[in-house]
Design a protein with these regions (language model features):
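Active-site and adjacent substrate-binding regions of carbohydrate-active enzymes
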Residues: 1-209
């Protein structure tokens, strides 16, 4: 992405995203330790995305930090490619448990499940049975729980969007420079003639100096 941004420079804006309907949740893909797939990590990924010289695309549920849904049977999947992957894994000699593990990690159903608006039976999305089961974390990760709390992921994204809107000359139109760091830190500088911001993101599990 940094290479693309440098090549485009002032010619055009790239479209940047962490998630879409054809991939698992970004917290599961990009955060190795399951214990770290939390609000802090979701904000970090948001920081990586929102201040680039690009048009950021926020996929439904990303703004509240939704993560993959662990399913206990292949019958719980709707995505045809997930069923094909499961069958192929069995044909290659993997056990049913191993095949299901692979599918849970990779399935497109992870980002195709209903939006979690609240902790009710169908997550505030509907009052009838859903085409896919509600995410198992819906009672903890939902819009209603986050909407009035400034410390949650949703507030971070709202503030980041407001910051972009208030600083178009800097964050949208300003220059972009990737900063030289170690492999576990992603940092970049945005600047115009009078202001600058430096965005530093520690992707490791330890404090960095």
């Amino acid at each position: 992405m940094h290479y693309l941004l440098l090549k485009l420079k002032s010619i055009s804006l790239a479209g940047a995203f962490h998630e879409n309907h054809d991939m698992p949740r970004s917290l599961n893909r990009l955060v190795k330790n399951p214990a770290d797939r939390n609000g802090k990590a979701a904000k970090l990924l948001g920081s990586l995305l929102m201040f680039l010289k690009s048009t950021p695309y926020i996929y439904e549920g990303e703004e509240i930090g939704m993560i993959n849904n662990e399913r206990s049977s292949i019958d719980e999947f709707d995505d045809i490619s997930s069923h094909n992957q499961y069958t192929r894994a069995l044909e290659e000699g993997y056990s049913k448990e191993e095949a299901l593990h692979f599918v849970n990690r990779r399935s497109r159903d992870n980002t195709r499940s209903p939006m979690c608006w609240n902790s009710s039976e169908y997550g505030g999305f509907s009052d009838v049975k859903l085409w896919l089961a509600l995410n198992e974390h819906a009672s903890e990760i939902n819009v209603e729980k986050q909407i009035n709390d400034p410390d949650f992921v949703l507030s971070f994204y709202k503030n980041a969007i407001a910051l972009r809107q208030e600083n178009v000359d800097l964050i949208v139109d300003g220059s972009f420079e990737a900063l030289d760091t170690c492999d576990e830190v992603v940092a970049y500088r945005r600047a115009n003639d009078s202001e600058e911001i430096i965005c530093i993101n520690n992707m490791s599990e330890r404090n960095m100096k």
